[in-house]
């Protein structure tokens, strides 16, 4: 089982992005590439060559690309390892030994890895370029003002809609959550039992949306000063409207493929679908111009449109005996080599370069829905906070599922989640004191 970028996002949305960024397999467009053994040499941290680890991607050509990038670096020989299996567990274990990588790709680093001194501070590498990185994806890689990994590319989720289906019932693309609820109901009623109004996933949306509705209500999972960000009546109102979608029977459930695959949307089983940027090329190929994309609509007077974003990053092991050389290499690759960064983002899948300037220049992202997506990621993107722990994620995910599918009281459910999240934040603070 290899982690995927799609999973990274599920985690960023509030789904146990750590357990599922959140899936195994191919949910992000860069998923499971098979189950062979690790290739490309052993761990590093000794002298001479630098050892670099990547999780095993499923997109054809990616492995060859990263080996080509490494070979182009002339100051030091870089040996790439392509790691199948549970990559997060492998790197967590390797960071505790002298046989791990010098440089490694990471969905993080985690708070424990940062506070445990297992990764190297990379803040100095961002001099003069920090403002060119999407701040939403840089934030979870930052702790107490220091940056611990360089974002490689950005992935995101967004709402797809069929222009012709909305036009048929005289609807505009929904800009508020109320409009989304109403549009989904009208589209379902007009669908002659063949087409549902909205597809959020076969579980009704708890797994795919996560914290997105909270951000759309102007809230957050964790505030910038480290407090619970959704202890507010508007949180319950927002989640109650997800229940309304389910109760109205406006949601497609039991589709042959889940939310991360655009097949249900392409086949006309749903007029609107929550999915990811990775799905855009397939949708465009099948539907031409008969679709558009939107962020999750805002909720309430203090709300704002919202999209979850996430990014794998490049980090340096604190066990490396070549930290200076490792830092110099990843600065060269992920900050200086703009051509490689754009190639990695767009030649083997469909992703956004982590540098805002590169995203704006990329020809594949300049027009239509792709350009809209880049704008949403820049203007409306949020990422899973570093302090949003697995225990808090799990409590929220379970509560959201009960609210949507069982009609549980949102206020009651969220009070329990707020209490659990507060306990987690206190635990984290005690550990750091």
Identify the residue ranges that each predicted region occupies.
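Conserved N-terminal structural module of periplasmic/extracytoplasmic solute-binding proteins
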Residues: 2-111, 300-302, 325, 412, ...
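Extracytoplasmic/periplasmic substrate-recognition and gating elements
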Residues: 71-72, 169, 240, 244-250, ...
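Short helix-initiation/N-cap motifs at beta->coil->alpha
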Residues: 82-90, 178-179, 254-263
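Hinge/lid segment of periplasmic solute-binding proteins
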Residues: 108-157, 292-294, 364
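Short, solvent-exposed loop/beta-turn-alpha elements that line the ligand-binding surface or hinge
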Residues: 123-135, 191, 197-202, 219-237, ...
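Long, aromatic- and glycine/proline-rich binding clefts that accommodate carbohydrate-like moieties
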Residues: 136-140, 294, 345-398, 402, ...
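Extracytoplasmic/periplasmic solute-binding protein
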Residues: 148-152, 157, 178-228, 270
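Glycine-centered hinge/linker elements that transmit conformational signals in sensory
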Residues: 184, 227-254
